[in-house]
Amino acid sequence: PSDISSAGTKEFDLLMNKGRLLDYRDRELKAYLMLMDMIPALENDDLKRMGNIIWEIEFRGSKRAEVEHHSFEIYHYMSRLREAGFEFVGMSSVGPSIAIITEKDRAAVEGIVRGLGLSITVETMIDNEGLKITHTC
């Protein structure tokens, strides 16, 4: 839990100034990760690989600015969740909340997050029919 604000002038400056500068610097790497790594991972339903890519992006561009803004305490929790075996861990775009995607069942997830002093706030199922990639010549 954090009492750091995510709405206001300071946050706007963070995301629109520092975040955009960092996005500009990391644009080539992020584009490469999306095109060369994420799309194939999505096509292959490779959740672990998707999680590794998102984990890398968490510390690039505007996501890095958000993690820094919310203190490295959020990184600490995210890192512990990854170490616990969750395939996909990232900070939500409306942080400071952590999003996980996993193949583990709810009982396993509850046990792990409770052990870290966290709780499940929202749970949803993935719509595996939502992405369709069509190749044309």
Task: Give residue ranges: language-model regions.
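Active-site rim beta-loop-alpha module in soluble metabolic enzymes
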Residues: 1-69
